[in-house]
Each structure stands twice: as C-alpha cells, then as structure tokens.
C-alpha cells in the first residue's frame, strides 16, 4: 500500500523541502509514498487571489477564508473520499509516536497548513478535521509542522528504514521511552572512553546496559514515560 499525502498550503514551493532528503526522499523517489501539493490560492475567485479577510468581532491579523479553503478541500475529496483530514494547530492533540503509527496505516491523508492568525473555525467543524500540534510553541504557519508529521509517519512504513531494529530501539518506540546513549569509533576521545561493557563482546550484558540506560535517561528527563512498578529492576 502506497502512503499518499495531500498538502493544502498557500506556499506550495516549500515542498518537498526536507522531505526530499535522506531516507524520506529516497522513499518518495521510489514511490513508497506520494506527495501531492495543492495551492490554496488557486481556488480563490477574485483577481487578487485573496485567501484571507478580517476577523469578525475584531482582533489582530487576518483569518483564512472558509469559502476558498472549502473549495480546495472539496477538490481533494472529489477523488479521495476516504482521506484523513488533518489540521496542524497549537490547539490540537500533541503529536507522539503512537499517533504517527496510527496515521501511517492510512492510505491517504490530507494536511491543511494554516497561515496568518489561523483559519475560519467553520472549516474544521464542517469537515471534522483531526487537529495535531507538534509542541507548545507558535510557528508562522503549518508547513514546517506538517513536514515533521509526515516524516514521523513515513519512516514507519516498511521499506523506508532498511534496518528495522533502528526503529524498534528508538526513543518513544523502545520499552522505556527514550533511547540509550550511542557511541562509535574512536574508543577514546579527548579523555572520554566508550563504556567498557559495549566493547566487551558480552551481548547479554550489553542488552542489559542498554535497557538500564534507556530507563535511567527516561526517568531523569521524561519521568512520565516510565513504568514505576518495574523501575527497581533497572536501577
């Protein structure tokens, strides 16, 4: 199954951007996933291609117009009725690995990228958008946030990351949340040594060290991700 992504934006030239590089870009070139970028402005009907207007009730900034965005969405739905509609928003549910895993199983998703002060709320309510946030901070638009979401989904698709163990052992995928510390050659650098267990050749001890490291790092930095009932085993 090919993972199809539709992007609704007023800045289509921003794509594929970072999605055109590394394993994500290679997967795009191989057809493992497809990217369809749609310019919202092309659905504006006035000569100036206006996509925004002043907010009712007053307030700073401009709001993206429901009629223009609605026409763009209708165009997508005319050929992809089952697409999952997503809006990148600081008010949305916070993105995590579980959400990415769920979305990666869809054959078609459509991401709406807002700009200015946001979009007319009626659009989100009428089409029942799933709102997603990538963190508690504000960006100038949804394009960069959509790239984050897409990458987290695409790399979970079989065939994108060649080493399956890489995904299994990563932060938020491994049993205890955050990934253990990683090292490579040289074994000694500026007086700092690689942990001796990692060069011991004893795979049982190495695996235990990785589990302990993962748990300790998670407990220190993201304690809400740890299972306190099992904690003593890994101290």
Swiss-Prot record:
SUPFAM superfamilies: alpha/beta knot (SSF75217). The keyword Nucleus does not apply. Keywords: Cytoplasm, Methyltransferase, S-adenosyl-L-methionine, Transferase, tRNA processing. It comes from the Bacteria. GO terms for cellular component: cytosol. Homodimer. This is tRNA (guanine-N(1)-)-methyltransferase. One of its GO terms (biological process) is tRNA N1-guanine methylation. It is found in: Cytoplasm. Specifically methylates guanosine-37 in various tRNAs. It comes from Ehrlichia ruminantium (strain Gardel). It catalyses: guanosine(37) in tRNA + S-adenosyl-L-methionine = N(1)-methylguanosine(37) in tRNA + S-adenosyl-L-homocysteine + H(+). S-adenosyl-L-methionine binds at residues 114, 134-139. The keyword NADP does not apply. It is an enzyme of class 2 (transferase). Its EC number is 2.1.1.228. Belongs to the RNA methyltransferase TrmD family. It holds the Pfam family tRNA_m1G_MT. InterPro entries: Alpha/beta_knot_MTases, tRNA_m1G_MeTrfase_C_sf, tRNA_m1G_MeTrfase_TrmD, tRNA_m1G_MTases_N, tRNA_MeTrfase_TRMD/TRM10. GO terms for molecular function: tRNA (guanine(37)-N1)-methyltransferase activity.
């Amino acid at each position: 199954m090919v993972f199809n992504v539709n992007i609704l934006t007023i800045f289509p030239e921003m794509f594929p951007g970072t999605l055109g590089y590394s394993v994500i870009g290679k997967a795009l070139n191989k057809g493992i996933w497809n990217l369809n970028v749609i310019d919202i402005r092309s659905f504006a009907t006035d000569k100036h291609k206006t996509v925004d207007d002043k907010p009712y009730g007053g307030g700073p900034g401009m709001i993206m117009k429901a009629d223009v965005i609605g026409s763009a969405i209708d165009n997508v739905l005319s050929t992809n009725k089952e697409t999952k509609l997503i809006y990148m928003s600081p008010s949305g549910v916070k993105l995590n690995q579980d959400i990415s895993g769920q979305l990666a199983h869809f054959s078609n998703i459509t991401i709406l990228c807002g700009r200015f002060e946001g979009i007319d709320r009626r659009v989100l309510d009428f089409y029942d958008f799933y709102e997603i946030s990538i963190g508690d901070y504000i960006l100038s638009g949804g394009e960069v946030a959509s790239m984050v979401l897409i990458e987290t989904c695409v790399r979970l698709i079989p065939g994108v990351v060649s080493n399956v163990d890489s995904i299994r052992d990563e932060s938020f995928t491994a049993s205890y949340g955050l990934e253990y510390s990683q090292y490579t050659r040289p074994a000694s650098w500026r007086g700092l040594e690689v942990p001796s267990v990692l060069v011991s050749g004893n795979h049982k001890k190495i695996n235990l060290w990785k589990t302990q490291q993962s748990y300790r790092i998670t407990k220190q930095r993201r304690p809400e991700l740890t299972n306190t009932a099992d904690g003593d085993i890994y101290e």
